[in-house]
């Protein structure tokens, strides 16, 4: 019983220690993430999540023989729509 309690306390202490020491100045990091997210909400053009680099733009060939990324729009009829 005592060993179980000691193990639980040790695990809790090590977990808390890991979270505290994982990111130096964690309050600044969280603040910067909040400001960046707020900026992206106000200006959706600034969001990198809306940009797809793994797809073909409209007008590019997308036939059956082509091996590569799919069309950004999802529509293909010999050329991306």
Curated annotation (Swiss-Prot):
Cross-referenced Pfam families: Conotoxin (PF02950)
Any one annotated GO CC term: extracellular region
Cellular compartments annotated: Secreted
Bridged cysteine pairs (disulfide): 55-72, 62-76, 71-80
Expression sites (tissue/organ): Expressed by the venom duct.
GO molecular function, a single term: ion channel inhibitor activity
Keywords per UniProt: Disulfide bond, Ion channel impairing toxin, Knottin, Neurotoxin, Presynaptic neurotoxin, Secreted, Signal, Toxin
Signal peptide: 1-22
Record flagged with keyword Transferase: no
Main location class: secreted
Propiece residue ranges: 23-51
Protein family membership: Belongs to the conotoxin O1 superfamily.
Function: Omega-conotoxins act at presynaptic membranes, they bind and block voltage-gated calcium channels. Act on high voltage-activated (HVA) calcium currents in molluscan neurons.
UniProt free text on domains: The presence of a 'disulfide through disulfide knot' structurally defines this protein as a knottin.
UniProt protein name: Omega-conotoxin-like Vc6.4
Taxonomic classification: Eukaryota, Metazoa, Spiralia, Lophotrochozoa, Mollusca
């Amino acid at each position: 019983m005592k060993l179980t309690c000691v193990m639980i306390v040790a695990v809790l202490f090590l977990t808390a220690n890991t979270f505290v020491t994982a990111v130096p100045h964690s309050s600044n990091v969280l603040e910067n993430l909040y400001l960046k997210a707020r900026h992206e909400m106000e200006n959706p053009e600034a969001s990198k999540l809306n940009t797809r680099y793994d797809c073909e733009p409209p007008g590019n060939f997308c036939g059956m023989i082509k091996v590569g990324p799919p069309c950004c729009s999802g529509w293909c009829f010999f050329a991306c729509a």
